[in-house]
Amino acid sequence: ESPMAGDSILRPELSTAHLGQADRDLDYEARYQLQPHVVYLADSGGLKVGVTRQTQRHTRWMDQGASRVRVIAETTNRYEAGVIEVALKNHYSDKTSWRHMLAGVQSGENLAEEALRASQFFPEEAANFFVPEGEEVTLTYPFKGAPKVTSVKLEAYQRLEGILAGIRGQYLL
């Protein structure tokens, strides 16, 4: 089985490379898991918590269609970030509300204040990863008009015609 489909891809708290233990392929997992990661709060149709590799953060945020993001923790590996995310999932969603995101709904929360609030939920052993002055980014996705949100499975069509008004995250509008 491919290491790119390992459990720790979607559930970072299951990472084991920091222990020298393989899930599927230790060489691959060490390269992927044993590098700096960030935990962030994103406004993408509502406030959510997420984890990504430090080097991929901006790409990840654009893929999710986030309008605003704030880094709240910087860790040395994927496992540490996963432990923080699990604790925060008791207080924040870890899913993007794609319909709200595409409709332009924003949480309106002050991300700096929300980051401070989130830090109270960090596990004690991970408190030192909190970044009080974390990077904050605003992203825009220009398109004409308010899109009508309709889900379409592209595989069902040999040809699909229309006007591409914009792109937000992984969604064509």
Question: Model-derived features: where do they sit?
Answer:
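Non-catalytic accessory segments flanking enzymatic or RNA/DNA-binding domains
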Residues: 1-173
